A protein has these predicted regions:
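Helix-to-loop junction immediately C-terminal to a conserved catalytic motif
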Residues: 60
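Helical segment within the ABC ATPase nucleotide-binding domain
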Residues: 177-191
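ABC ATPase C-loop
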Residues: 154-155
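ABC ATPase NBD coupling module
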Residues: 64, 76-97, 120, 132-136, ...
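The feature captures the beta-strand-to-loop junction immediately N-terminal to the Walker
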Residues: 45-47
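Catalytic Walker B motif of ABC-type/P-loop ATPase nucleotide-binding domains
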Residues: 162-166
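Conserved ABC transporter NBD signature motif
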Residues: 68-76, 88, 118, 122-125, ...
Length: 244
């Protein structure tokens, strides 16, 4: 398997070493080895059910770890609670768009805020649409606005590693394009290490210079996005298009 190295040991923001994980006794991930350099952006693609969301859940501490280690900036975080992983520097925008529906958009950001470069103003600069809706409650926002808010909430906690799970899911194409432009701008300029899980392979390969393909709970490709973008047949083989 082709494999890209995510920086030197001193530069690695996040590392999964021989990780085996799942839910209870059910193992979903096998022998996951992934290193993410500081300021590096990686997309994770693959069919539904291959373990992409479980990968992020394992990094956040939501799964049962059956083997291996998860390290953040060289520190083993495998045995610590999720809330402590957040204080150590993980930011997470989950697939479920976890926001407080009865709070205003502004209040949703305020409760997640921690000191650092990301503030209400910088989130609004990234997502101007949110500034226009700042005083609307969470349950009054569209799906696209809720997704932008979920990412904004993760950012305003001022992480060093940002995890995003399926940000384009269920959104209209015009909103997907708007969101993609913002996410690409974010990953290029923020200095954050970022893992983007995305079902839309074309979108993922455009945003992230490095791609990871998963199949049946394992990483089957880790290398340049450009290689896959230029060879759709190879991407289809890796993902398992047409396989029953």
């Amino acid at each position: 398997m082709e494999r890209a190295e995510g920086g030197t040991m001193a530069e690695r923001a996040l590392e999964l070493d021989k990780v085996r994980a799942g839910y209870g006794e059910t193992v979903v991930l096998e022998d996951i080895r992934l290193a993410l350099g500081a300021s590096e952006t990686v997309s994770v693609i693959g069919r539904n059910g291959v373990g992409k969301t479980t990968l992020l859940a394992t990094i956040m501490g939501h799964t049962t770890l059956h083997g291996g280690r998860v390290s953040l900036h060289g520190k083993d975080i495998s045995g610590i609670a999720t809330y402590r992983r957040v204080t150590e520097g993980l930011g997470y925008a989950p697939q479920e768009r976890e926001i407080f529906p009865s709070l205003t958009l502004r209040e949703n950001l305020e409760v997640a805020a921690r000191p650092g470069p990301w503030t209400m103003a910088t989130v609004f600069d990234l997502f101007p649409r949110l500034a226009e809706r700042a005083d609307n409650r969470g349950n009054q926002l569209s799906g696209g606005e809720q997704q932008m808010l979920a990412i904004g909430r993760a950012l305003i906690s001022n992480p060093t590693v940002l995890l995003m799970d399926e940000p384009s899911e269920g959104l209209a194409p015009v909103i997907v394009e708007e969101l993609a432009r913002a996410v690409k701008s974010l990953t290029q300029a923020s200095g954050l290490a970022t893992i983007l899980v995305e079902q839309n392979s074309r979108l993922a390969l455009d945003i992230a210079p490095r791609a990871v393909v998963m199949d049946r709970g394992r990483i089957v490709y880790d290398g340049p996005s450009e290689t896959l973008a230029q060879d759709p047949a190879k991407l289809d083989r890796l993902i398992g298009v047409g396989r029953k």
